Amino acid sequence: MRVMVLSRGTPSPEAPLRGIFEYDQAVALRQQAHEVVLAVLDARSARHWRKFGTRVEHAVERDDGITVVRLDVPVGAVSARTDHRVHAWAARRLHRTVTSEWGTPDVIHAHFARFAAAATRAEFPEPLVWTEHDSHLANPDRRLTEDISVAGDRADAVVSVSQGLSSRLAGHGITSTVIPNIVDVDLFDRPARRHEGTVVVSVATLNPGKGMVELAHAVEQVPGVQLRIIGDGPQRGSLETIAANNPNIVLLGTQPRERIAEELAGADAFALASHAETFGVVCAEALASGLPVLTTACGGPQEFIDDSNGMVVPVGDVDALADGLQQVLGRPWDRAAIAWQARSRFAAGPVVDQLETVYRQAISSHVTTG
């Protein structure tokens, strides 16, 4: 099957997690013998320096062999109307390049409402599948509300990455199939590294919604535990202040997934104190490493974290986080069983099987207009 994946970006050394969900799916589809072109529409403002215009790349740094067609347009903060028009124009230009160079896709797979709506406004004639990941659906602004409506009216199939997100889409009158994000389980399947003391790893953007300051305060209540934090963001200064008085709080900054996998292999547990998550891929990656996970009841993670692989505590409760850490760290875990469970749920094979079913349904139900 020939698939055009419409994405917001691709991972890079400067932004290793940008577009990572879309990229992982594209790689997995190609590995299952599908023809895949990743059409990237990067509409970030000009302060994110990059070459503007359309260009073709072949992603070979990991031998993935994915063809990437990029269109970089510095849009930034503009009115909803202008945003819609620019994205539709850019999507149309990407589509024209893809079809002229590689032929007509069997299906368009757009990630996020913004890009599914752009495909709709650009009047793509092919079947359209829309996957939603965005936590902002809980409180959408005007632009997102309009994009949801436009994409929902046009998409031949809609996918959500969690049941909670599916319920939010249902509130907009949109029915969706729940398919989780893909985890590179082979990358995270590493032998546990021996280390001194007790180590907990957490990975998140350092903003208030991720609860990292709360987690750091919780660790202060659990003697002998080192918290290794991967990520960066506006709360780094607050965390540096905490770390200055507690050598067991270690800030590692933003790291590529290979380094994250190394850190998880040397840990005893993973913790996420987020206030809201649509899926929580970092929790799934930790499970793939065989780690038990302590998470808050923030949405997506609580759909796959239970007594067999971790613990769920209330959001924003430092004492509950501290107690949860003590319980998770004080219990023996079968790391091999945790990793196997993650592989059976989040590995590329099972997820691609579900995507192929959705693609066939979209193609079958699609009615060409115009």
Regions from the language model: what does each represent?
Residues 4, 192-210, 216-222, 228:
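Conserved donor-binding/catalytic core segment of Leloir-type glycosyltransferases
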Residues 238-258:
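Nucleotide-activated donor-binding/catalytic signature segment of Leloir-type glycosyltransferases, i.e.
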Residues 307, 311-318, 326-332:
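Conserved acidic donor-binding segment of nucleotide-sugar-dependent glycosyltransferases
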Residues 333-348:
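A short, well-ordered alpha-helix in the C-terminal region of glycosyltransferases
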